[in-house]
Amino acid sequence: MAPAASRLRAEAGLGALPRRALAQYLLFLRLYPVLTKAATSGILSALGNFLAQMIEKKRKKENSRSLDVGGPLRYAVYGFFFTGPLSHFFYFFMEHWIPPEVPLAGLRRLLLDRLVFAPAFLMLFFLIMNFLEGKDASAFAAKMRGGFWPALRMNWRVWTPLQFININYVPLKFRVLFANLAALFWYAYLASLGK
């Protein structure tokens, strides 16, 4: 290992356990990129829902210790089967459809993400959550009528600067992770819409 890299890690304060965990994550990312991103998305999505429940409890000043275990489970399923894999392939194909050398590539990528991927992904979120919650088509239609546009407008406000950074400056293999970390708070917002 290069001395400069070792020194940088030491200065960053990474202990042995975080270094090993990071090395293991990078190895899995290289060997099993879709599965690693799916697992990461599932875990962080569940954590986002758990965070939403904790925020909701604090806001309502509830003292009960009970949590809706189904919420994090639904978000874990959605993150594992949809967010991780779909985001992986979207970022991968976007990199090939709009390579960095293309004029205005950053703007084109952002427009593709914001005007095509974001609305479709949000609609998919509402559909899958409706199914996982055991609700019928009329509940989905009501959620789309009442929650889709407010959620999409909030998505555009919150995610546009984050996605500009993610799409144009974050290395391809880390884009799903970057989005997942930001999504901790986004899923907390979406979960609060469901209440």
Swiss-Prot record:
Keywords: Membrane, Peroxisome, Transmembrane, Transmembrane helix
Keyword ATP-binding: no
Segments crossing the lipid bilayer: 31-51, 76-96, 115-135, 174-194
Protein localization: Peroxisome membrane
Spans within the Cytoplasmic topological domain: 1-30, 97-114
Keyword check for Lipoprotein: no
Record-level GO cellular component terms: cytoplasm; cytosol; membrane; peroxisomal membrane; protein-containing complex
Domain of life of the source: Eukaryota
Peroxisomal side: 52-75, 136-173
Bilayer topology annotation: Multi-pass membrane protein
Function in brief: Seems to be involved in pore-forming activity and may contribute to the unspecific permeability of the peroxisomal membrane.
Subunit structure: Interacts with PEX19 and SIVA1.
Family designation: Belongs to the peroxisomal membrane protein PXMP2/4 family.
Full protein name: Peroxisomal membrane protein 2
Organism: Homo sapiens
